[in-house]
Regions:
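Membrane-interface interhelical loops and short interface/amphipathic helices
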Residues: 99-170
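N-terminal amphipathic/basic-hydrophobic helices that include classical n-h-c signal peptides
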Residues: 1-13
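Short, charged juxtamembrane terminal tails flanking transmembrane helices
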Residues: 339-344
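Hydrophobic alpha-helical segments involved in membrane association or supramolecular assembly
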Residues: 11-121, 169, 173-337
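Histidine (H) residue identity feature
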Residues: 5-6, 20, 159, 312
């Protein structure tokens, strides 16, 4: 699975998908390294089991009590998990959580497909609306532009002024579209980069937790370190859930855009409506998506409590708030100035 999202352009999309796939391949290729830690973990767990069993047996003998065998099975159960860590532990967790990932990915794919269909319908209706208006038809159609030029052939000064004005207006329209497309492409790159950053951090965390997992299980055998086992499990599940949370966030953005595009289509179906061709709403959602991707770790932490991730979540949220404020202010100022000048 890859971290996909609905707010994405066609150019360069394949490159980003390849990078996400590289991260998936990296996780798979790094899993054999778990075996290198198994031997060390066995030694740690064996030493811990020796102290654990000896302590429990000595306490029972000192108190002249019967030896309770059931608690003594804990080190052996953990040792069994260490011996078959990739299969019993990682395989079980990934198998249980995989349907969640697939379910959220299907939700996102369905919403994105509906949004893309509505977007194509909106673009077609917008073009038809501009073609219906004689004052804007020549801006989007070369045939209409050539037709108006042919109607004003001659040396009439009035026609020359009109033709010059048409060329200038068409040039400004094309310049406006080009600048809007360039600004959208820039935001799309930032959006893709945000998704790639989250995916890279997620993959790194999963690899570290997977490779060093046997060591964590071995340490958990010792008295006083029992919480290491539950801490490792909660952190692994929390990081693993970053992907379905990301898909749910993308699904929400796609649904909101679907509703917005639906309203635009309803307005464009009115013959009296004249579209302005601006992409302000799209740009706003791009900015929301860029900042929103960095709160995914916090939301995943709400699903399952992972105490050790608190500092990371706090730091990354503070960093995002600062950088988001600066980036949002800069992008808003630039976008506002550009769109303001173009509308004039």
């Amino acid at each position: 699975m890859t971290l996909k999202h609905p707010l994405q352009g066609e150019g360069g999309l394949m490159d980003f998908e390849n990078l996400h796939q590289v991260l998936r391949t990296l996780y798979t290729e790094m899993m054999p390294l778990v075996g290198n830690m198994t031997g060390i973990a066995k030694g740690v767990a064996g030493l811990g089991a020796l102290f654990y069993v000896a302590s429990r047996v000595w306490q029972s003998l000192a108190r002249a009590e019967e030896i309770d065998v059931y608690p003594l099975l804990r080190p052996f159960a953990i040792g069994l998990c260490i011996m078959f860590f990739p299969t019993i532990v990682l395989g079980t967790i990934n198998s249980v959580l995989s349907p969640v990932v697939k379910g959220t990915n299907q939700m996102m794919a369905a919403q994105t497909l509906d949004m893309n269909k509505l977007r194509e319908q909106r673009d077609q209706l917008e073009r038809e609306a501009m073609l219906r208006n004689p004052e804007t038809a020549f801006l989007v159609s070369n045939e209409e532009f050539d037709k108006k030029i042919d109607e004003m052939q001659g040396l009439n000064p009035k026609h020359l002024v009109t033709i010059t004005s048409m060329y200038l207006e068409r040039g400004m329209y094309n310049l406006k579209k080009s600048m809007q497309d360039a600004f959208k492409s820039f935001l799309e790159i930032l959006f893709q980069a945000a998704a790639l950053i989250i995916d890279t951090i997620r993959t790194f965390f999963l690899i570290v937790l997977s490779i060093l997992g046997p060591i964590a299980f071995g340490i958990a055998v010792f008295d006083g370190f029992q919480s290491t086992l539950t801490g490792w499990l909660s952190r692994y599940v929390s990081v693993y859930l970053w992907l379905p949370v990301s898909d749910l966030f993308s699904t929400m953005l796609a649904k909101i855009q679907t509703l917005m595009i639906g309203k635009e289509i309803a307005a464009l179906e009115n013959p009296a409506y004249i579209p302005d061709g601006s992409s302000v709403v799209y740009i706003i959602f791009m900015l929301i998506g860029i900042v929103g991707y960095f709160v995914i770790p916090t939301v995943a932490g709400w699903i399952i409590q992972a105490g050790g991730m608190g500092n990371y979540g706090k730091n990354i949220n503070q960093t995002v708030q600062k950088s988001g404020a600066v980036a949002g202010a800069g992008a808003g100022a630039v976008g506002g100035n550009v769109l303001g000048k173009l509308r004039k």
